[in-house]
Each structure stands twice: as structure tokens, then as C-alpha cells.
């Protein structure tokens, strides 16, 4: 029987977790309140540690040792067979813990040798033996925190690993709490188990969405903050459907491009240059009513319509609202809206982008500039909270070759320090990972 520990913010929660894992087969030995420091002492958290053992089968707990459970029962009558009673007590204690078993084994052997000697005596002798055993158990229990601190190095290691990958504080905090809640103490001792569990949660945080199959005209609209690369990304998408895809299918789709970006210097010129290279028409609209006119016209003569929008800061609520007017003008059309975000953005900034651009009812994300970031933790942290799927990822400036279908493995390739990463990336998540439709 092993000495185990459960950690929780309160004693009640710790006991609840113990009961959930082990049922009624537990024996609580000791409770300790601790102040633990995180992030190099900047944050302190109060926790309660409960040390306990688990009874299996017919094994007894410390509370089942004769005269510990009820001393009055022992003191009610004289003991006729002292050594037999000692053996019973010692064997009960032996099943609590391996360390205790090691210390009481010589006492059991000595008692068995004297078992034939029956000397009537008072219960005080048995009571003294019980007190000795209780002291032994308490001493071993008191030494447990040193062992536990070493065993919980796995928690400290995974916390540091997540920090090095730029995961947000909230993601790290939730992951550590979830580890302690869902894994047994035995599993927490193994860093390999801890790492594989956290890696699985990271994978589960990434949701992939396959582009829809449409029978009519597809109206693909890109929205997003300034500087994330919407115009270049839209050119890559247009080139994929107009140049790359026909080589595979043998079918040449009809493609049109519209831009509403009249404010950024050179934006329309940049898109016009891309269209000239691909032999596509570009329409620059100045107002929502003009946008409606061209969208209506293109529904009859085009297979795919791409719409580039002006980039605005997520805190520029006034101009974002003005952009919404364009969308209201075409509210009767089925729009395929994608929010374009920079892979290197901070988690807090991404949360704000998700919040402000929710007005556009985007269906999925396009993650840009994956090649320009060294850490992916901020992105995954934000994705785990928003649960917004990804459809495309860009990995460079080349049109159209640096546009890729979103995949779990592509994002995992940016993680650093996970020894089990190669094994996970060897799993077949398909072209789109965990698909959502």
C-alpha cells in the first residue's frame, strides 16, 4: 500500500477528488496547508495537501488497527494472549505502507517466536504498542513532503515548457489544474505521461474546418486587422482556384475579385497588379450600394467571387462599424467570411480581434505568416478559448505556393521542447486534422 497525496484549493475539494478516484477505500492520514509560488514568485496560491493511503481487498487502514479505531474496546477486558494481539496489530500496520512494513517486520517475527507464551496482562501493553505504531506512521507521513516536492517536478517542467512556447498564463493555469484533477498521483510522477497528456490537449485545442462544397457561386470574403496580409492571402486564394486547381481538375472556373479597400495607399494597386498577372478582372467599389450592384451581377456569371476589405485596428470600433455597412448591403447573399489573423499575435490581441470582428459572423480563420513566428503558444491559447476553426494557413509571400490547407501537424511543427512531438506528428490527422463542418 502506497502513501498518496491529493492537492486542491480547499480541503473539501481535495477530499471530493480523492473519493471520486478511489471511492471509500481511502484512509486520510494527514492534512497540510501550503502557500505555493508560481512564475518565479510573482504569484502565490494557497493549496491544501491531503496525505492518504488506499485499502485494497482485505487490507486494513490505520484506523482499523485494534485499539486505534476504538481504544475503549481494548481497555474493556484483559488480553489473554499478548503476543497474538501484538501480531494482529503489527500485521494491520504492515499493510498501510511499504516503509512501515519494513520497520514492523522484525517485530512481527519476534512476536511470532513468543506466540506460544501466554501470559495474562493488562491492555496497557497493547495500548503502548499502538501508540508506538502511530508515532511511526506520523514520522513517515511528515517526511512525505520532501518526496512529493521531487515528484511534482513534472508539473514544474511542463509549466516551464509551456512558458517557453509562449502559451498564455490562463492556458498554463488551466492545464496545470486539469492535470492535478484528472491524473492520479502515480501518473503525475511521470513527466512522459504529463507531457503526452498536455500535448493531447494542445491538439484538441486546434479545430480544422474544410471549405464547403457549393453548387452555386462562392462568395469568399476576407476581413481582419491592418497588416495581417489579407491582400496577399486573397491573391493566393484566387491563384489557387484560377491557376492551380484547373490543372488538377481540368475545369477552368470563372473568377472575379472585388476590393472595398480605398483607404490604404497602394492597396488597390497591389491587387490590380496581382489580377493583371493572373488575367483577372478587378472591381474597386466606393460605396455599399456599388458593392451590392457588382455582387448581384457576378452571381449570374461567376463561379467564385473574392472580396478584399480594408484593414482596421480591432479597437477602431467606428470604422469597423462602417465596414459592416457593406455587409448589410449584401445580407441576402450567402457569404463565406474568413477572419485573417497573424500567427505571431499575442493571445490578448487575438481575443480582442475575435471579439471586435464577431460582427462579420466569420465562419473560420485564415492564419498568416506562420513562417515568421518562432512560437505558436499564443495562437493555440487563443484558439482553445474561442474554439474557432482554421481553414487555411500561409507560410510565405510566394503566390500561390505558400498557401496551405490547415492541418494540426503544420501547427505542431512550431512547438519546441516536446520530446513526444515527433511521435504525435507521426499520427495521421488527415489533410484537415480534426474536421469540423
Swiss-Prot record:
Coiled coil: none annotated. It is a peripheral membrane protein. GTP binds at residues 224-231, 308-312, 368-371. One of its GO terms (cellular component) is plasma membrane. It is found in: Cell membrane. Signal peptide: none annotated. Gene3D superfamilies: Flagellar FlhF biosynthesis protein, N domain, P-loop containing nucleotide triphosphate hydrolases. SUPFAM superfamilies: P-loop containing nucleoside triphosphate hydrolases. One of its GO terms (biological process) is SRP-dependent cotranslational protein targeting to membrane. Keywords: Bacterial flagellum biogenesis, Bacterial flagellum protein export, Cell membrane, GTP-binding, Membrane, Nucleotide-binding, Protein transport, Transport. One of its GO terms (molecular function) is GTP binding. Belongs to the GTP-binding SRP family. Necessary for flagellar biosynthesis. May be involved in translocation of the flagellum. This is Flagellar biosynthesis protein FlhF.
Amino acid at each position: 500500500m502506497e502513501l498518496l497525496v491529493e492537492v486542491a484549493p480547499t480541503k473539501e475539494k481535495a477530499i471530493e477528488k480523492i473519493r471520486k478516484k478511489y471511492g471509500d477505500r481511502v484512509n486520510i492520514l494527514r492534512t497540510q496547508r501550503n502557500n505555493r509560488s508560481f512564475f518565479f514568485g510573482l504569484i502565490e496560491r494557497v493549496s491544501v495537501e491531503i496525505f492518504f493511503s488506499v485499502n485494497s481487498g482485505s487490507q486494513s487502514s490505520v484506523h482499523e488497527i485494534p485499539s486505534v479505531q476504538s481504544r475503549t474496546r481494548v481497555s474493556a477486558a484483559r488480553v489473554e494472549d499478548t503476543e497474538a494481539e501484538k501480531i494482529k496489530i503489527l500485521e494491520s500496520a504492515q499493510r498501510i505502507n511499504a516503509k512501515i512494513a519494513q520497520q514492523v517486520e522484525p517485530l512481527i517475527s519476534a512476536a511470532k517466536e513468543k506466540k506460544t507464551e501466554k501470559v495474562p496482562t493488562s491492555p496497557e501493553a497493547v495500548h503502548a504498542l499502538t501508540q508506538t505504531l502511530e508515532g511511526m506512521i506520523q514520522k513517515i507521513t511528515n517526511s512525505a513532503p520532501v518526496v512529493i516536492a521531487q515528484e511534482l517536478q513534472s508539473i514544474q517542467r511542463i509549466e516551464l515548457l509551456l512558458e517557453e512556447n509562449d502559451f498564455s498564463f490562463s492556458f498554463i493555469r488551466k492545464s496545470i489544474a486539469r492535470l492535478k484533477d484528472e491524473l492520479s498521483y502515480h501518473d503525475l510522477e511521470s513527466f512522459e505521461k504529463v507531457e503526452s497528456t498536455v500535448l493531447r490537449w494542445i491538439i484538441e485545442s486546434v479545430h480544422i474546418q474544410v471549405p464547403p462544397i457549393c453548387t452555386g457561386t462562392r462568395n469568399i470574403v476576407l476581413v481582419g486587422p491592418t497588416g495581417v496580409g489579407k491582400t496577399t492571402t486573397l491573391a493566393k486564394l484566387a491563384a489557387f482556384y484560377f491557376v492551380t486547381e484547373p490543372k488538377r481538375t481540368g475545369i477552368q472556373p470563372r473568377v472575379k475579385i472585388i476590393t472595398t479597400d480605398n483607404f490604404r495607399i497602394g492597396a488597390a494597386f497591389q491587387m490590380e497588379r496581382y489580377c493583371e498577372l493572373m488575367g483577372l478582372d478587378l472591381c474597386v467599389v466606393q460605396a455599399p450600394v456599388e458593392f451590392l450592384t457588382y455582387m448581384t451581377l457576378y452571381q449570374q456569371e461567376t463561379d467564385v467571387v473574392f472580396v478584399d476589405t480594408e484593414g482596421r485596428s480591432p479597437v477602431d470600433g467606428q470604422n469597423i462599424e462602417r465596414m459592416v455597412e457593406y455587409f448589410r448591403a449584401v445580407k441576402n447573399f450567402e457569404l463565406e467570411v474568413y477572419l485573417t489573423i497573424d500567427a505571431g499575435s499575442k493571445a490578448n490581441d487575438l481575443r480582442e480581434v475575435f471579439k471586435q470582428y464577431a460582427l462579420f459572423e466569420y465562419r473560420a480563420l485564415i492564419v498568416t505568416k506562420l513562417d515568421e513566428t518562432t512560437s505558436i503558444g499564443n495562437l493555440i491559447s487563443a484558439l482553445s478559448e474561442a474554439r474557432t476553426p482554421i481553414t487555411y494557413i500561409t507560410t510565405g509571400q510566394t503566390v500561390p505556393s505558400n498557401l496551405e490547407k490547415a492541418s494540426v501537424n503544420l501547427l505542431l511543427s512550431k512547438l519546441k521542447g516536446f520530446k513526444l512531438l515527433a511521435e504525435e506528428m507521426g499520427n495521421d490527422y488527415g489533410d484537415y486534422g480534426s474536421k469540423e463542418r
